[in-house]
C-alpha cells in the first residue's frame, strides 16, 4: 500500500530536484561581504542546475557566531530559493560543498559563468526577526528620509589599520567639510543620519551638528592602532550575541539606503550594499576615493 502521509508526498515532490548545501570560510569578513560572495556561489550553483541552500557555519570562525555550530546565514537571512534546511535534509538528492573560500578570482569566474541567473528570494532577503529589528529603528531614527543626508563614516580599523589593497577612508574632519558643502548645495537637506561603528565619531559629529544629526542605538567601539574590529570582538571579555552584532549593521545600512543623498568615507561592503538597496534613487552621491593602502 503506498504511503499517503504529507511528509512522503513532500519528498515525492522534491525527488527530481538536486539541492546543493553551501558552506564557506570567511573568518574576518564583514556581513555584507559574506552575503555578496555567498550569493555568488549560490547563483553559480543555480546556473548549473542545483537549488542552492545555505548552511553557513564557517568552521566556527565568525564573530557573528554564538558557538562553533551556529549557522550565521539562518541568523539573518532567508533561503534564496525558499526551501528550508529541514526540507532539504529530508529530500532525495542532496549534495554538500566542502567549506571553502572564494576569493576575488574565484568569485569573478563564478559571476561570469552564472551569467544572468538570479536568485528567487521568494520570502525576501532578511528573516522575520531582522525585518522587525530594521522597522523599529527606521521609525525611531529616520523620521524624515526625504530631508536627510546619509553619511557612511567608517572609523575603527578602517582608519587605525592599513590593510594591503584596502581602500583608504576619509577622516572625520574631511567628512565634516564635505557634509557642510552638501548641505549648502541642497537646502532641502535639514538632517544628517550617520552610519558608523566608531564611538569617537558619534561624539565628534554630535558636538558639531547637535540635534541635526542622528545615529541608531547600536553599540559602538574604538579600536587601537593596528587592531582589527573582528579581533576586538573575539577578545571581548563579555561576548555579545552575534545576532545583534549583525542586525545593528544591517539596520544602520538599511536606513542609509533610504536617505535622500549619500556621502561615504570610502569603499567597503557596506557602501556596496547601501547602493544596491537604494537602487539608484539617491539625488546626490559622493564617495571619497583616496586610493588603496600599499
Language-model features, listed with the residues they occupy:
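N-terminal pre-catalytic "stem/leader" segment of glycosyltransferase-like enzymes
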Residues: 13-56
